[in-house]
Amino acid sequence: MSMASLYRRSLSPPAIDFASFEGKQIFNEALQKGTMEGFFGLISYFQTQSEPAFCGLASLSMVLNSLSIDPGRKWKGPWRWFDESMLECCEPLEIVKDKGISFGKVVCLAHSSGAKVEAFRTNQSTIDDFRKYVVKCSTSDNCHMISTYHRQVLKQTGTGHFSPIGGYNAERDMALILDVARFKYPPHWVPLKLLWDAMDSIDQSTGRRRGFMLISRPHREPGLLYTLSCKDESWISIAKYLKEDVPRLVSSQHVDTIERILYVVFKSLPANFNQFIKWMAEIRRTEDVNQNLSSEEKSRLKLKQELLKQVQETKLFKHVDKFLSSVYEDNLPYVAAKVYCDGDEILSGYESDESCCKETCVKCIKGLGEEKVTVVAYPSGNDVFTALLLALPPQTWSGIKDQSLLQEMKQLISMVSHPTLLQQEVLHLRRQLEMLKRCQENKEDEELSAPA
């Protein structure tokens, strides 16, 4: 049975259309008072949700792009850009398309995308706190707010909804909602008290109250080299292996050397592990870097090169390298094999018209004219596993019975002596693992704070 078509909805008072005469007045008043600073960054990336239930994804991608947070992976063509289709780590897109997404899962996505996030439910805050945070985001261009609320409290059709808050008029105590369902409602001003009441409602899917989150740019780009991929449900089994099986394996089996620990971890790696951790190097040959990259891109590649060098200078890397060199390729998942074309060789200008191994995803593609550009999608080497072992929580190894071996392992994975750049990269991976664990256990709506 076909559904009757609709063309937008009329705003009901007390909401005021942003483009109306009064809406413009409210905007000008707020602009004069300095509470529209965040508006311009947001409006530059204002988007319409691509599916009726994608309001949470659209709001988040809009905010991440407005903060110039680099996703570290391509959207389309050569472009790195946040799109709703890329925000799938905490809930499969098909489920979001059908049922929408919870507040906790949007918070999870924001954390996993590398943003700094502060999230509050209405029962964890007050209207005065909310007003203070609205002012904070409205007077700055490096912090934005996403609100989740029940539309019917605002006399609008629909139920739960997400949208960014684009500004605030203090004299009128009104907030600007940049409604991402632009096919339905235009941006509009609403009394802040009414918006609070709309947030102070129960989400029937979780039994928890709605709320708001503050999203800001981290001190540095997250995931310069490594990130976790959750494009399909395989990540569930892999996250379980890393967070549950590895601690059990090292505590239940006799391990008396570091090499034996590595063997126990690697021998049971899920077959699809190479799709779980991806390398975001996007490295090109030296002459191509000099010719076609901006100074910002060159600086980024230099950081990646330094980070890769730091990984390979760790004592743990030397153990991993020795271990993988001592076993045959077919005794381990292929992704763990020692390969010829490690990332450092590409970084130093290794040239070849063909991929030098099957699984490293080294591709030579045509650039301008007949020039070829070497792109490394993800490594299949020792540095990946070194980074992963460093990223596992320290308590992973607490079940090792040999106390001297336990102390040696603790020293190998300790972040204290490592450079700041490597520490930040490892902590980013560790937080991603923790967020995935929360999602796997359906605890993302219980704990909104960033993983420690």
Curated annotation (Swiss-Prot):
Organ and tissue specificity: Expressed in shoots, roots, leaves, stems and flowers.
Signals that turn on the gene: Not induced by cadmium or other heavy metal stress.
Enzyme Commission numbers on file: 2.3.2.15
Domain Peptidase C83: 1-220
Catalytic activity annotation: [Glu(-Cys)](n)-Gly + glutathione + H(+) = [Glu(-Cys)](n+1)-Gly + glycine
Activity regulation, free text: Requires cadmium for activity. Also activated in heterologous system by AsO(4)(3-) ions, but not by Cu(2+), Zn(2+), Mn(2+) or Ni(2+) ions.
Residues making up the signal peptide according to the UniProt record: none
Chain segments annotated as coiled-coil in the UniProt record: 287-315
UniProt keyword terms in alphabetical order: Acyltransferase, Cadmium, Coiled coil, Metal-binding, Transferase
InterPro entries, sorted: Papain-like_cys_pep_sf, PCS-like, PCS_N, PCS_N_sf, Phytochelatin_synthase_C
A Pfam family: Phytochelatin_C
A single BP term in Gene Ontology: phytochelatin biosynthetic process
PANTHER family in the record: GLUTATHIONE GAMMA-GLUTAMYLCYSTEINYLTRANSFERASE (PTHR33447), GLUTATHIONE GAMMA-GLUTAMYLCYSTEINYLTRANSFERASE 2 (PTHR33447:SF22)
Function: Involved in the synthesis of phytochelatins (PC) and homophytochelatins (hPC), the heavy-metal-binding peptides of plants.
Other noteworthy facts: Expression of PCS2 is too low to complement a PCS1-defective mutant.
Entry similarity comment: Belongs to the phytochelatin synthase family.
Name of the protein: Glutathione gamma-glutamylcysteinyltransferase 2
